[in-house]
Every structure is written in structure tokens, then in C-alpha cells.
């Protein structure tokens, strides 16, 4: 389960580094601390996210200054996302970053959650800090470009996509971003050219068909949009993203199928409790 990272070497190293200090602590607290961490993993692996959250909180509260708490707070944020507690998750990530500002994993997790909750200014700030440390990281640049695009700061979005291409001229991810950007700008002919090219290169990629469906919907070509949407669902193999469901809901609403639209919206809302975009 990707949201519950068994801290592996990092956790073991942190625990070892703390062992000298632990000698000054009550041995029972140290033993209980480790037991609570183990219980949190066991609960999470069984799908008991409320239990995992409770065990992690108890471990952090038991020894508040333990250096491993940085990683436990990141895990706590992931568990809280799975529970749909997005604001609590943001608070957990922020507490972890206050202790270790350079932790890229936690900052990326917070940036994605900011974007998921529509807080794109905050997301851009986190992505910018990540990019300052890794200027050519394609994932960071792409995600910041998408936040810029949703903020209608199209020139800044284009700049990030251009940076990706400068470092990787064959990047299909950047081309997908350009297709979405040109659609948002209303440059539909250029967007269609990009998506048609991507379909030939990434014929089994659901994101490409979802992107072209957005284009067709913007051009009021609902039949074509629905065709690409169904292809995207087929390629998602029963695991559609919330954005895919919301887009199909929008298409079905436009076609007058309100029942299907409402069903997809409910499904999207349920998935968003657990989803990182």
C-alpha cells in the first residue's frame, strides 16, 4: 500500500541514531514506542486506517522529540488522506516539514494535497521549493505547470513545460501538458494536433484519451468526447481516477443522462478521500 511506507532503512537508521538518547528514557516508553509503530503498520495493512492513525498519534505523543517522528508524521498524513481527513493530513505534513524542511517526499506529498484541495498558490510554493533543489525534475515541473494552468497563469505553465522539453526533448508527458494547456487557452486546432500525435505514441495511455475527451467537450463535440472517455475507462482497467469520473459526469450531464452523471460524481467524491493526483 503506497501511502503506508514501511520506513525500512530510513526508519532503522533513525531508531539506531536515537538509541544513545533512548538510554536516558524509561525503557518501557521506548519499547511501547516501537510497539505502537509496529501496530500502526499492522493496522494499515489490514485496511484499518483509523487504527493506524490512532497508533501513530500515540507513538508521536509518547516521545514527542524522537527524530523518527518526522517519518511518522509523513505516514500519519498519508493515513489521514486515506480517511478523507485532508486538513488533518496537511497539518501532519506541515509539522513534519517544520522539523525537516528539506524532506522532498513530505513536501511533494503536501504539494499534491494542496493541489487536490484547490489550494494552488500553496501547491506552487511547495513545488517551487522542490524545483529549486532539482531544477530538471520532470514530475515537479509538470505538476507545477498544471497548477499554474488551473490558476490561468498560462505563460508560467508554458515556461515549465518548455523547461521539461529542454531537458528531455522526447518527453511525452510535456506534450500531454501542452495539449491540456492549448485546450485551456482555446487553441483547439493545435491541441487536437498534439493529442492525435499522442494517441499514436501512447495508444494504451488513459490520460491521453482523457485529455482529448476534454478537448472534444470544450469544442462541444460530446459524442467524440464520450467515445474517448469510454476508451480511457477501458484502459484504466476498473480503477478510474476521480478526474476521469468527474469528466464523464460532465459529459453525461451534457448528454442529458443525469442519473449516470450523479453516480460518477458520488464515485469520484468517494475516491477523492483516498486519492493523490
What are these regions (language model features)?
Residues 20-73:
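N-terminal leader/linker segments that initiate helical-solenoid repeat arrays
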Residues 64-67, 101, 135, 169, ...:
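Short coil turns that delineate tetratricopeptide repeat
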Residues 69-72, 106, 140, 174, ...:
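TPR alpha-solenoid repeat register
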Residues 45-46, 82, 116-117, 150-151, ...:
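Register position in tetratricopeptide repeats
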Amino acid at each position: 500500500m503506497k501511502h503506508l511506507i514501511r520506513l525500512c532503512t530510513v526508519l532503522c537508521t533513525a531508531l539506531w541514531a536515537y538509541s544513545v538518547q533512548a538510554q536516558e528514557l524509561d525503557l518501557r516508553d521506548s519499547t511501547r514506542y516501537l510497539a505502537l509503530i509496529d501496530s500502526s503498520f499492522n493496522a494499515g495493512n489490514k485496511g484499518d486506517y483509523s487504527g493506524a492513525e490512532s497508533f501513530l498519534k500515540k507513538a508521536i505523543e509518547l516521545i514527542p522529540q524522537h527524530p523518527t517522528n518526522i517519518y511518522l508524521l509523513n505516514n500519519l498524513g498519508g493515513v489521514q488522506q486515506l480517511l478523507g481527513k485532508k486538513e488533518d493530513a496537511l497539518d501532519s505534513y506541515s509539522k513534519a516539514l517544520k522539523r525537516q524542511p528539506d524532506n522532498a517526499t513530505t513536501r511533494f506529498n503536501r504539494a499534491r494535497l494542496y493541489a487536490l484541495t484547490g489550494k494552488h498558490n500553496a501547491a506552487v510554493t511547495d513545488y517551487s521549493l522542490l524545483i529549486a533543489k532539482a531544477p530538471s525534475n520532470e514530475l515537479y515541473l509538470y505538476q507545477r505547470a498544471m497548477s499554474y494552468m488551473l490558476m490561468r497563469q498560462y505563460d508560467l505553465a508554458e515556461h515549465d513545460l518548455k523547461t521539461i522539453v529542454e531537458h528531455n526533448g522526447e518527453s511525452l508527458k510535456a506534450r500531454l501538458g501542452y495539449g491540456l494547456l492549448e485546450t485551456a487557452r482555446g487553441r483547439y486546432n493545435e491541441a487536437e494536433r498534439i493529442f492525435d500525435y499522442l494517441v499514436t505514441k501512447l495508444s494504451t495511455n488513459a490520460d491521453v484519451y482523457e485529455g482529448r475527451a476534454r478537448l472534444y467537450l470544450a469544442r462541444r463535440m460530446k459524442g467524440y468526447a464520450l467515445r474517448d472517455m469510454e476508451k480511457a475507462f477501458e484502459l484504466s482497467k476498473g480503477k478510474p481516477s476521480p478526474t476521469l469520473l468527474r469528466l464523464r459526469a460532465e459529459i453525461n450531464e451534457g448528454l442529458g443522462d443525469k442519473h449516470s452523471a450523479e453516480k460518477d460524481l458520488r464515485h469520484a467524491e468517494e475516491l477523492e478521500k483516498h486519492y493523490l493526483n
